[in-house]
Amino acid sequence: MSNKIINLGSIEIANDKPFVLFGGMNVLESRDLAMSIAETYAEVTQKLGIPYVFKASFDKANRSSVNSYRGPGMEEGLKIFEEIKKTFNLPLITDVHEPYQCAPVAEVVDIIQLPAFLARQTDLVVAMAKTGAIINVKKPQFLAPHEMRHIITKFNEAGNDEIILCERGSCFGYNNLVVDMLGMDEMKQSGYPVIFDATHALQRPGGRADSAGGRRAQATELARSGMALGLAGLFIEAHPDPDNAKCDGPCALPLHQLENYLKQMKAIDDLVKSFDPIDTSK
């Protein structure tokens, strides 16, 4: 098995390369907040020497309640993304939910994300593939790691092999997620880059009646465990005031802790990738 390298400008995304941070905020709450959060991430990652891609959503189409905040929408969201890219010279990642969104979004962002709940929607997969953009596939909470090969095949047959696989936890009974560390290693055997969404994996789906709960206090422990696997990247969301975030605040890392948090993740990644591989199958 060889590790596939995805080139994003000067950034190399691969399981045996230094990890790439995919980070930002859950949903675009306002232009000013997005700019402020992007600036913090840009400054911290530049200081620590971590390759970085800014993440946010323009629409949260799968909220638990019809009354929950969804975002500014595609048109306004893309304007904010363009300003972030121009101001901070950052590559961007965002998710799409409908086939018609794929082409216009891919004109602005560098990586388009297939949401976990939509990962088997063939029309959406094909529309995403045809953009030629790099694709981040969120592993559905209800699929086994080895079933990701079917989604990969769909993208391949639609003409796109620039694929990243993202672990974000698996259903464990009702209102709970667990992370299968061996499952991430199994996905790595595909050769495609594997990243770990360490904040969404903290969710308790439906845990707050009309929205998801979370376990923010365990954000460091879970991320440390994932980084010990030697992954292509880490996916996190942070907020300056998580308790008042408009989406997934219970899972969000407090923004003021970002630098110390990433220092630890980089130290683990550097250490693990300095080791010679050991083949215990023989």
Swiss-Prot record:
Gene Ontology molecular function terms on file: 3-deoxy-8-phosphooctulonate synthase activity
UniProt keyword list: Cytoplasm, Lipopolysaccharide biosynthesis, Transferase
Reactions mediated catalytically: D-arabinose 5-phosphate + phosphoenolpyruvate + H2O = 3-deoxy-alpha-D-manno-2-octulosonate-8-phosphate + phosphate
Protein localization: Cytoplasm
Metabolic or biological pathway, per its Swiss-Prot or TrEMBL entry: Carbohydrate biosynthesis; 3-deoxy-D-manno-octulosonate biosynthesis; 3-deoxy-D-manno-octulosonate from D-ribulose 5-phosphate: step 2/3; Bacterial outer membrane biogenesis; lipopolysaccharide biosynthesis
Main location: cytoplasm
InterPro entries named in the record: Aldolase_TIM, DAHP1/KDSA, KDO8P_synthase
Cellular-component GO terms for this entry: cytoplasm
SUPFAM superfamilies found in the cross-reference section: Aldolase
E.C. number: 2.5.1.55
GO biological process: keto-3-deoxy-D-manno-octulosonic acid biosynthetic process
Family: Belongs to the KdsA family.
Protein name: 2-dehydro-3-deoxyphosphooctonate aldolase
